[in-house]
């Protein structure tokens, strides 16, 4: 039901994603054939209102959409259907490596959203390598949960609330071993990753509630080394910050504002120094 038109009498559109090397592609289809129908009236239909019927799973129902993951090899024209089922009525999110098509990283989340696992798929035979599992009650935070695949899967950066506060962790992408905590040192919440500089082993991210004299709902931007050292505040103005990094990770545009402050846009270097004001 998440992929295209859900009208009951129409075939749903499948989405395909290419690997970076164009050797393979994958499709994660949603099978909603057993899902019950829901009804609405289109009151704007001319000349008279029309009943519309579509597939929609209600909370607690037995039949919900089932995901089907398939991997296609371009050269051999072969297809592998991955046996990715682990949790009943699970949902999955998929993460590509940067250049090669040998692995496809996967996060499987159970229906109650309190248990997930991270693994990777061997795209040649469809086998799955389990890396680690995490349980969080009452549920995992879907908005901030992130997995970044680094250096063709040698390392992973993963967002977790395992200590009660949203933080970033560095994992071995081959074994699932936790290497170290990246963000640490206080009762603050790490938000979304803004950029990753693999060459200098540095991650840029938003965080909330670390600065005592700043509204805890304001997003401030920081950087840390992969080993957890060198945490640095890059946006010192006491406002809410939204940033966009350059491809080189050397610069970023910072747009900051508040309810009583008109937006200001500046260009900064990776250390947070203002190079020039763009808009005020």
Regions inferred by a protein language model and the residue ranges of each:
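A short beta-strand motif characteristic of beta-propeller blades
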Residues: 3-5, 78-84, 129-138, 177-183, ...
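Predominantly five- to eight-bladed beta-propeller fold
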Residues: 1-17, 27-82, 271-280
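Non-catalytic accessory segments flanking enzyme active sites
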Residues: 26-30, 35-38, 62-68, 91-96, ...
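Short coil/turn segments that connect the beta-strands within blades of beta-propeller domains
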Residues: 21-23, 101-102, 153-154, 200-201, ...
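Signature of short aromatic-glycine-proline-rich micro-motifs recurring in repeat-based ectodomains
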Residues: 2-20, 68, 93-96, 143-154
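Short loop/turn segments that connect beta-strands within beta-propeller blades
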Residues: 73-77, 123-126, 173-176, 225-229, ...
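Conserved hydrophobic/aromatic positions in well-ordered beta-strands
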Residues: 70-72, 119-121, 169, 222-224, ...
């Amino acid at each position: 039901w998440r992929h295209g038109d859900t009208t009951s009498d129409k075939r749903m559109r499948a989405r395909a994603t290419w690997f970076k090397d164009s050797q393979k592609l994958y499709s994660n289809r949603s099978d909603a054939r057993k899902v019950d129908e829901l009804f609405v009236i289109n009151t704007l239909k001319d000349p008279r209102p029309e009943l519309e019927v579509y597939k929609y799973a209600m909370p607690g129902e037995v039949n919900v959409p089932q995901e089907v993951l398939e991997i296609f090899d371009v050269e051999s024209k072969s297809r592998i259907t991955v046996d990715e089922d682990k949790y009943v009525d699970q949902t999955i999110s998929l993460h590509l490596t940067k250049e090669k098509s040998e692995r496809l990283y996967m996060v499987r989340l159970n229906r109650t959203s309190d248990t997930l696992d991270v693994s990777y798929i061997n795209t040649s035979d469809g086998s799955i390598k389990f890396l680690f599992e995490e349980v969080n009650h009452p549920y995992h935070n879907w908005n901030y949960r992130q997995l970044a695949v680094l250096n063709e899967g040698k390392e992973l950066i993963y967002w977790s609330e395992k200590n009660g506060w949203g933080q970033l962790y560095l994992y071995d992408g081959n074994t699932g071993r936790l290497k170290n905590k990246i963000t640490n040192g206080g009762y603050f919440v790490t938000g979304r990753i803004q950029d990753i500089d693999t060459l200098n082993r540095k991650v840029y991210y938003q965080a909330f509630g670390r600065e005592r004299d700043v509204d805890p709902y304001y997003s401030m931007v920081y950087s840390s080394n992969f080993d957890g050292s060198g945490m640095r505040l890059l946006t010192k103005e006491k406002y809410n910050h939204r940033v966009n990094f350059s491809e080189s990770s050397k610069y970023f545009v910072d747009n900051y504002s508040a309810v009583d402050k008109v937006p200001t846009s500046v260009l900064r270097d990776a250390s947070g120094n203002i190079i020039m004001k763009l808009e005020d």
